[in-house]
Structure formats: structure tokens, C-alpha cells
A protein has these predicted regions:
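Bacterial N-terminal signal peptides
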Residues: 16-25
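Contiguous beta-strand segments within globular domains
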Residues: 52-64
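Short beta-strand elements
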Residues: 134-151
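Bacterial N-terminal signal peptides that target proteins for export
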Residues: 4-16
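A short beta-turn/strand-edge loop motif at beta-sheet boundaries
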Residues: 67-76
Length: 151
């Protein structure tokens, strides 16, 4: 009877299944995935203004960035700016319409408008993503903005 041989085969199979379940996804993500660390994003300045002669508020948020992953340099990427009220309610999400080409270092400005009924204080979060806006490529930047005050 070949019991020891069958048991050994089951043991090898079990080890293979465990490795496949736990380690392959980790290796795959570290090799192929976006980690949110490819780009170092820094705050430059922001404005939350009433536009003269118009019935809207405008939000401008400027960032500088440095790409640490050579595979990301030259690729089309995107970024998202989310605007929240003080209590955390999402007011608006905006992005760069066709994305932009990532240079080794550079800057990117996000601009959007809000109705004049918007609160006078908002919280803004900016993050760079892949072109499809599904995977983060950078750290996020969070700033509280006050109407008619440049930061």
C-alpha cells in the first residue's frame, strides 16, 4: 500500500495551495500593482474665491510632485480633487479631463467651480491616480480652505 506516498502528495498540494493563496497576490501586487507611493505629492497653494461678476465660487489647488518610479515617468496619469463640507459631506469630485503626462518632477493645478450656496469653509483632498482613476499613485493632500483666503 502506498499511504505514505499519497500523504506526502497531499502535503505538497496543501503547501502549494497555501503559497498560491497568500504569497502570489502579494508578489503580484508588488511587481505589477500601483502602490500609492510612485509619486510624492506636495501642497503648493490653494484659493477658494468668489469670482467677480459671476454667481459661482472657484477652487484652485496647486500641487508639486516628484516621481520615484521610473516606469511612471512619461505615462498618462490622472488626479482627483474631492471637496467636502465641514461635516464630511462630499460636495464635488473633479479630475483632469484627459489626464496628463507624468514628468520626473512638475506641478499640477486643479480648478473647479461651486455654487454660491456652498459653505464658506471646505475640506479639499487631492490624489494622483492611474489614468482610469482606479488605483492611487501618490499620497493624498488634505487642506481646509476658507472663502476668499489664499493658502
Amino acid at each position: 500500500m502506498n499511504w505514505p506516498k499519497k500523504t506526502r502528495n497531499h502535503g505538497n498540494f496543501t503547501v502549494l495551495v497555501i503559497v498560491s493563496i497568500f504569497f502570489v497576490p502579494i508578489l503580484q501586487q508588488s511587481t505589477f500593482g500601483n502602490h500609492g507611493k510612485e509619486i510624492d505629492l506636495k501642497f503648493s497653494d490653494a484659493q477658494f474665491l468668489i469670482l467677480p461678476g459671476k454667481n459661482i465660487h472657484q477652487v484652485k489647488f496647486t500641487t508639486t510632485y516628484s516621481v520615484s518610479d521610473s516606469d511612471t515617468v512619461g505615462k498618462q496619469i490622472n488626479g482627483i480633487m474631492e471637496i467636502f463640507t465641514d461635516n464630511g459631506t462630499l460636495v464635488k469630485t473633479t479630475s483632469i479631463p484627459n489626464g496628463f503626462k507624468a514628468d520626473k518632477t512638475g506641478f499640477q493645478q486643479f480648478v473647479t467651480s461651486l455654487p454660491t450656496t456652498s459653505p464658506n469653509t471646505i475640506n479639499t483632498i487631492v490624489l494622483f491616480t492611474d489614468l482610469n482613476k482606479t488605483s492611487p499613485l501618490s499620497n493624498s493632500i488634505n487642506r481646509d480652505l476658507v472663502l476668499n483666503k489664499t493658502q
